[in-house]
């Protein structure tokens, strides 16, 4: 979805609710340059993905793990709660 900056200004609060509900970013166009409105959760997930894939070696390991999982050869034996506990209890 793409809207003008003027329209975004008029519809800001409904747009914030929309991107948090449907997780579809909204492109806001203006003469000064375009911007994107997206949920903070989606933004944080993108930032985490960029961080994890920044290292070519880490990216390779992650892609191999995804391929193993898709092939049904997942070595994942701990629950999310167990992993959270191992990581210090953070969500």
Curated annotation (Swiss-Prot):
What the record says about the induction of its expression is: Expressed in log phase cells. A member of the relJK operon.
Q: Which GO terms describe its biological process?
A: regulation of DNA-templated transcription
Task: Name the UniProt key words of this record, in alphabetical order.
Answer: DNA-binding, Repressor, Toxin-antitoxin system, Transcription, Transcription regulation
Tell me the GO molecular function terms. Answer: DNA-binding transcription factor activity; sequence-specific DNA binding
> Any keyword Protein biosynthesis?
no
Q: Does the keyword Transcription apply?
A: yes
Quaternary organization: Homodimer. May form RelJ(2)-RelK toxin-antitoxin complexes, in which the toxin is probably inactive.
Q: Which PANTHER family match?
A: ANTITOXIN YAFN-RELATED (PTHR33713), ANTITOXIN YEFM (PTHR33713:SF6)
Question: Its biological function?
Answer: Antitoxin component of a type II toxin-antitoxin (TA) system. A probable antitoxin for the putative mRNA interferase RelK. Upon expression in E.coli but not in M.smegmatis this protein neutralizes E.coli YoeB. Binds to and represses its own promoter, in combination with RelK repression is somewhat lessened. Several DNA-protein complexes are formed in vitro depending on the RelJ:RelK ratio.
By its UniProt entry, which NCBIfam families does this protein fall under? phd_fam
Q: Which family does it belong to?
A: Belongs to the phD/YefM antitoxin family.
- Protein name per UniProt: Antitoxin RelJ
Source organism per UniProt: Mycobacterium tuberculosis (strain ATCC 25618 / H37Rv)
